[in-house]
Each structure stands twice: as C-alpha cells, then as structure tokens.
C-alpha cells in the first residue's frame, strides 16, 4: 500500500506542476479522488489483506458513481477555468500538506523529465 499511496501523491504533485506550467494558456489540469470504487483492484493481493479487500467492497461505490467527478471536471462550465485543484465528490478539496508542496512538485517534474529523456 505504501507504493500505491506514493503514486497517488505523485499524481497530485505532477498535476500541480502541470497546472503551473500551463497557466495562462487556457488549458487546465486538475486531479481528483473518485472515492472508494468497486473495482477488481486488490483481488489478487493474497495473504491477510484478501479478506479485508473482500469485506471493503460492500462499502464501495459503483464505477459510474466514481466517474461523476471525472465527467464533471471534463464537461462543466463551472470549472472551465479552474486549474491545479484537487477534487472529491465534485468539490475542490485540500489535499494533504505533502501534496501541496510546490518544491516537491517541481522536483518530481524535473526527475520525471530526466527519466523520460526529455528537456525541461
């Protein structure tokens, strides 16, 4: 789970930096938490976590419900000029303090570009 959590943090940081770089272009970049969606994620976990994954699915939302914020961000005129934000249930929400660190966002961007063999 630690790797999964870090990947989600990186998604938020990368989006913040992308939004900063696109500022003034008319292109927006936002990220979101879809909620706990009933998917097959974790089905192959095995060990002690398998019963927890199975049990948790009773509290999950449908994929259609989980997609609502994605559709909202892609189509609503209410957020047409909103950028660099983190949304949950179609509402801008403050992510963790680590996810608001602009220096970390820049460093992640630079490291990603270097790993991809791209210039800044």
Regions found by a protein language model. Give the residues of each.
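Catalytic loop of short-chain dehydrogenase/reductase
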Residues: 1-27, 33-56
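Non-transmembrane alpha-helical segments in soluble domains
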Residues: 15-19, 71, 109, 113
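Generic hydrophobic alpha-helical segments
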Residues: 18-21, 80, 91, 119
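Short glycine/threonine-rich loop-to-helix capping motif typified by GTGT followed
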Residues: 43, 98-99
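A generic structural signal for secondary-structure junctions
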Residues: 46-47, 78, 117
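Generic C-terminal helix-cap and adjacent flexible tail
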Residues: 114-120
